[in-house]
Amino acid sequence: VADFSWDIRSPLDRALVAGRYGAQGDAGVALTEIRNFDLVQMMARRGKAREMTKAATARFGIAAPETPKAVGTADATLIWSGPDQFLVLSKGGKYTMDTLAPAFAGSASLSDQSHARALISVSGDKARATLAKLSSIDLHPDAFGIGAAAATSMDHTSITLWRGDDRNGQAVFNLLVFATFAESLWHTILDSAAECGVTISHSEELA
């Protein structure tokens, strides 16, 4: 019997070339892939939404979002992903299917999405202008402020989008995309941001 060895690779392993791209001068956009995260989809079972909400509050210390928002704790981000469902984004193995399942037994169905999605952070003073070319959502801070979230699409690709805390006074937008579409969306964002100048990198830190 042949032995197989499987290596976990980023879905952007080929597409991401760290460095500069596009216009010269000060870069208006920072495009970063976040790697090695834990992501669990939580979906309330039929008639159990209230029980799931109570379990989430007890487990995370905050209420899970019931509207399009992202809320954070010291070690996790809960992201609305649809009616009676949300995503748990974290690092370090504290919030995985195995560790969360006991608290939500009977109230929610859990699905590990850690290797099914790519996480892309778009930041900088031209981040909003870059994404505005690709999204039908109004990303102005008055309409899409810190903590706002949406299940939407960019370039005909379904994504989960939310705005993180500002970094150095600049907006930070986070995108979760299915791994099979990540490379295509990455190139689309690069093309959109090229006129602004882009710094490209990957990181182990959540944005």
Specify the residue positions occupied by each region the protein language model found.
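Basic, glycine/lysine-rich polyanion-binding surfaces/domains
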Residues: 1-207
